[in-house]
Amino acid sequence: MLELKEKLTEFARQNEIQIELLDQIDSTNNRAAQKCYGAGDVIIAETQSAGRGQRGNSWSSLPGQNLTFSVVLQPDFLLAERQFRISKTAALAVADTIADTGLTPSIKWPNDIYIGNRKVTGILIENDLSGAYLCRSVIGIGLNVNQTDFDPTLPNPTSLSREAGHTFDRAEIFIRFYQHLANRYRMLAEEEISDKNASQIDTDYLNRLYRLNEEHTFIDGRTGEHFTGTITGILPGGDLEVRIANTGQLRTFLFKEIEYVI
């Protein structure tokens, strides 16, 4: 934690934000919900006893090896029906950060980050609404940085260190992420306020999308049946669009209605 504290305390001062560094907590997202944090503030914990991922999964991480944190945003310019764009923004910020290391990340819908067929980052986003607009978003991120040994029951974990063959400075990785998030978030706000038809965020997300235009085996989360299909795109609300191989039918799936077979 010391190497994080020294660099991130100065980074927080320069950017006029609060970065709270904790040894242990139940969940950084939970803490963000319980205390009053401003836009751009961050909670980082070495250990989370109840770290959460998508689909209700837990997120485990060895102390001192990775980055587990939450960032608070106030996207009051974003309509609730377009909230999936926050997921795109966060996923792209992580992907941009990993790409800076020379590795090649992809985004597994909706917002897991993969290197090859292995998961390096999980993202959990929790939004609050005020009328038709978002008023607050908490972006929870678990980024595997230097951990190389994982629980054997986990299906396909990896880390930056395992993929690159060397360790990384966690503070530098976090600072790069925060800078990329600020850039992507600024891009999101500009696109929403100007109501641009062409979206760089949407284009970049598709370009990073795991298994896009590739035939793949999936599980229908509603029936448990395996099927083969090809991801063709993402609808504005975030639904995954898949062309079914044996019928040619184009179907859309909500989160938890489809699983990848990896």
For every predicted segment, state its role.
Residues 112:
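Conserved active-site carboxylates
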Residues 1-100, 119-121, 168:
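N-terminal lobe of the biotin/lipoate ligase/transferase fold
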Residues 2, 14-15, 76-79, 85-105, ...:
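Long, positively charged amphipathic alpha-helical accessory segments at protein N-termini or as interdomain linkers
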